[in-house]
A protein has these predicted regions:
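Cytosolic regulatory/linker segments at or just downstream of nucleotide-handling modules
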Residues: 65-67, 89, 95-143
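N-terminal start-of-chain detector that recognizes signal peptides
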Residues: 28-33, 73-75, 90, 105-109
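An acidic- and aromatic-residue-enriched active-site/binding cleft used to recognize and process polar
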Residues: 10, 38, 106
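Structural signal for well-ordered, non-membrane alpha-helices
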Residues: 37-44, 66, 93
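Catalytic core of nucleotidyl cyclases, primarily class III adenylyl/guanylyl cyclases
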Residues: 1-31, 44-84, 132-135
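Secondary-structure boundary motif
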Residues: 45-49, 94, 113
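Hydrophobic alpha-helical membrane-association signature
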Residues: 31-35, 39, 84-88
Length: 143
């Protein structure tokens, strides 16, 4: 779906859906949600005959990031992304229920014509003075 895996942090995966001359911001948001839903569905199939269930939560935000080598030549250096958009996505993942995709209002506005929402609510996240409007995705609609 056009993702770039940025890193694995413990049991978390940070994936990027980057805009390009061939891929719009809206398409990136759609593909991110599609990938999250596909991962959840794949785990449902995987878990069918398992006693110990594997579950994931998905948090998706859209926005500007700072991308590049972070660190120094003398110590650890990683090519990664940082910024408020990344932090919000991480907070959404933490706030999501197991087996669900939670998107920011920014992401929702990019794909609102192609997504069915199960629930909309506001959450308080660390580092933000105001509550964030978030949407729990029920399903994507065909483009």
């Amino acid at each position: 779906n056009g993702a770039t895996i940025d890193k694995f942090v413990g049991d978390a995966i940070m994936a990027l859906f980057l805009e390009s001359k061939n891929r719009s911001h809206e398409e990136c948001a759609y593909n991110a949600v599609k990938t999250g839903l596909e991962m959840i569905e794949a785990l449902r199939t995987f878990n069918q005959n398992r006693q110990d269930q594997v579950n994931i939560r998905v948090g998706i935000n859209s926005g500007t990031v700072i991308m590049g080598d972070i660190g120094s030549k003398l110590y650890r250096r990683d090519y990664t992304v940082i910024g408020d958009s990344v932090n919000i996505a991480a907070r959404l993942e933490s706030a999501a229920e197991k087996g669900s995709v939670l998107v920011s209002d920014t992401t929702y506005k990019l794909i609102k014509d192609f997504v069915e929402i199960e629930d909309t609510s506001s959450i308080i996240v660390k580092g933000k003075a105001e509550e964030l409007l978030v949407h729990k995705v029920a399903q994507l609609l065909p483009i």
